[in-house]
Regions:
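Short, low-complexity, disordered segments immediately C-terminal to signal peptides
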Residues: 25-49, 53
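C-terminal motif of bacterial Sec signal peptides marking the signal peptidase cleavage site
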Residues: 20-23
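Structured mid-domain segments that build the active-site/substrate or prosthetic-cofactor binding neighborhood
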Residues: 299, 303-306, 314, 420-528
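Feature activates predominantly on carbohydrate-active enzymes
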Residues: 113, 121-124, 128, 164-360, ...
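Aromatic-lined carbohydrate-recognition surfaces of secreted/lumenal glycan-active proteins
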Residues: 362-388, 439-446, 476-481
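Catalytic domains of carbohydrate-active enzymes that cleave complex glycans
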Residues: 500-653
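Acidic, contiguous N-terminal accessory segments
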Residues: 25-27, 66-75, 79-172, 208, ...
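Substrate-binding cleft/loops of secretory-pathway carbohydrate-active enzymes
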Residues: 379-407, 452-460, 485-494
Length: 653
């Protein structure tokens, strides 16, 4: 179980010697600091790697407090698995030095009364340093060596200058006068800096909501001349998968920075990119009408404009922390268009695209609110019939164009001009990049038609994020299975996508190294069986359906019969056997559970190629595992049937 870490606060005399402690506002005004202290652990390490299951619901957890020693109980319904991949001495990290000084000699300094996200990340720094080294613990005495988190009274001119060079929600890590500083341009950046230090030096891997791993390292030296600064490429990063969407801690660890679905107060997470009201398909709601797909308003009707403008102001007034207001078309099916009245059509014909009338409308909204709501952007979609950029109209400076890739192929990279679907999208993004300073992307990273089918897009994820970076994209929204936990690779895919958004400059080799590391620690010793499954089905899928979209059913990617007209039972059974072997090789019950949950996709594959009786048998297995692991949806907005009889099972086909 997690060890209870009690914070002790220095005596009044010591506080006076360090400087009177005051609060720090959200503008990063320097404040005095509180010392958290260190000491050598006396815990007896175990001799073998452990998988520790902890429940914050029933455990005491440490909280950095303002001048008092306090133990707080945090409500949570999720158990976290912390796997310590230990050295021979039973400790994940035998030796950690900072600037040549052993970690045991360091104390932790954090801004008193500062943002909750900074103080929470300091809590986690203490927790994982103690777990990793068995040497970092709280002590009452001060030290000549400090780890300084955020804006404090320890700031030197060198630190202030380094902080000023940080952009967006990035951070800098550097040594100065015997202190290691981790600080950002904002509170959220400081939090991310702490998590990056834990990942880059301590070997912590925040793999999933329920799984954090400390990997084996014998010795780590943080050099005395360390000076690392990370400035994010994308100002907005949103990995829109279930755990990222609904668990703020998971999103924070992943460095996702949108908060429209968060129940956590914005200040507690250090701010972020937030929407006023709904974040997409808002045009009917802004007219006080119920949402209706495939129906669009007349964008040259003055009454429509004035009503939308009035409600835009109301939404912004009700959400003063929001930085974006979405004024976006209703969802629509392929081939559907917007208003076809003479006035709208005249603009569209002149601009060569229905985006003509939409962008005229959006620019007018943006101009009318810019003085009253400085720093707020109007977001609209380039989606379906509005995807093509207009000939002469350019987005206003406070307009965001969110270009959507829903029609694209996801077994070819978006930059691959040999793919006809992606060639057209490439032309569109190039046109938008030439006229738009605030270009966001809405990308699709899952199969919306069948949640249980392997989606063979892992080989293009790195390429596609590179593609966005190279076309001046400033924000990325990656839609995934957001309505339910998944029986495919939700945890792996969202982990890799978040890594790419935070660091799109990583090499392809680094991307695949992250993939292999995740598979190893999340699924256990049989991870190579799972990698073989992924590789085999990716190649098989490309062969039988070279252009995979997000609405393709499983049997289109993995046909029930082979080229000779025979059932593909051998392929599907071979793939299931790989999962069964991985299950047997998994070392812990948690890893076995991960394997079993993700094996749903293999049972569904067997269903695709089976006889009538076999199909029902495998679907019953799929259904049973979905019930066991709380999987509530089998496709986009389609919940699982409420029983496992044959009639209801047919809906899963």
């Amino acid at each position: 179980m997690k060890k209870k870490l009690l914070l002790t606060i220095l005596s009044c005399l010591l506080l006076l010697s360090l400087g009177l402690l005051t609060s720090c506002d959200s503008g990063n005004t320097p404040a005095d600091s509180t010392v958290e202290g260190t000491s050598t652990s006396t815990d007896t390490p175990t001799d073998t790697p452990t998988a520790e299951v902890t429940s914050p619901t029933t455990e005491d957890t440490e909280e950095i407090t303002d001048g008092t020693t306090e133990v707080a109980t945090e409500e949570d319904t999720t158990e976290e698995i912390t796997t310590e991949a230990e050295t021979d001495d039973g400790i994940p990290l035998n030796n950690l030095t900072i600037g040549g000084v052993d970690i045991q000699n360091y104390t932790l300094v954090v801004q008193e009364g500062g943002a909750a996200c900074v103080r929470n990340s300091a809590d986690e720094l203490i927790e994982y340093l103690e777990k990793a080294t068995a040497g970092f613990r709280i002590e009452e005495k001060a030290s000549d060596y400090e780890i300084v988190i955020g804006v404090t009274d320890r700031d030197t001119d060198k630190i202030k200058a380094a902080r000023e060079a940080v952009e967006l929600d990035g951070y800098t890590l550097l040594m100065d006068e015997g202190r290691l500083y981790i600080t950002g341009s904002c509170d959220r950046g400081t939090m991310y800096g702490v998590y990056c230090f834990l990942e880059d030096y301590i070997g912590v891997r925040f793999l999933a909501k329920d799984t954090t791993v400390i990997i084996n390292q014998d010795s780590v030296e943080v050099p005395a001349d360390v000076h690392t600064t990370h400035n994010p490429v994308f100002e907005m990063r949103d990995t829109y998968w279930y755990d990222m969407r609904y668990d703020q801690t998971t999103a924070n660890h992943a460095k996702d920075n949108s908060f429209y679905d968060s129940s956590t107060p914005v200040a507690d997470i250090g701010g972020g990119i937030g929407y006023a009201g709904r974040f997409v398909h808002t045009i009917n709601l802004l007219q006080d009408l119920p949402y209706q797909g495939n129906v669009q308003p007349c964008l040259t009707d003055e009454a429509v404009y004035q009503l939308v403008l009035s409600n835009v102001r109301k939404w912004l007034d009700a959400n003063p922390e929001a930085t974006i207001i979405s004024v976006s078309q209703n969802d629509s099916d392929p081939g559907k268009l917007g208003c076809q009245c003479a006035n709208c059509k005249a603009i569209d014909d002149r601009e060569g695209t229905p985006m003509g009338s939409l962008l005229t409308f959006i620019n007018r909204i943006a101009n009318d609110i810019k003085d009253d709501y400085p720093g707020v952007y109007v977001d609209t979609l380039a989606y379906r019939y509005t995807r093509k950029a207009p000939k002469t109209i350019k987005p206003a400076d406070n307009v965001i164009i969110r270009l959507c890739s829903i029609e694209c192929c996801f077994t070819h990279a978006l930059s691959d001009e040999s793919c006809s679907k992606n060639k057209a999208f490439k032309e569109d993004i190039e046109a938008w990049a030439a006229i738009c300073d605030n270009l966001y992307i809405w990308d699709y990273t899952y199969n919306a038609e069948t949640y249980f089918t392997f989606f063979p897009n892992f080989d293009v994820l790195w390429n596609n994020v590179q593609f966005y970076k190279n076309h001046n994209v400033t924000g990325v929204f990656l839609e995934g299975q957001q309505v339910s936990v998944s029986g495919e690779f939700a945890e792996l895919r969202s982990y890799l996508l978040a890594k790419l958004l935070w660091d799109p400059d990583m090499t392809k080799e680094e991307y695949y190294a992250y993939m292999d590391e995740f598979l190893q620690y999340y699924y256990g010793a049989g991870w190579e069986k799972i990698k073989e499954y992924m590789t085999t089905l990716t190649e098989h899928g490309k062969k039988h359906n070279p252009h995979v979209g997000i609405f393709d059913k499983g049997d289109k990617m993995f046909p029930a019969v082979d080229d000779k007209g025979k059932r593909n039972t051998k392929l599907s059974r071979d793939m299931l056997d790989l999962w069964l072997e991985a299950y047997e090789l998994a070392e812990t019950e948690e890893q076995k559970a991960h394997v079993e949950k993700s094996s749903i996709q293999a049972y569904y594959l067997c269903h695709l190629s089976g006889s009538s009786a076999e199909r029902i048998k495998y679907l019953k297995k799929v259904y049973a595992l979905c019930e066991k692991y709380g999987i509530e949806y089998y496709k986009y907005v389609q919940p699982m049937p409420d029983s496992s009889n044959s009639n209801n099972l047919n809906s899963l086909i």
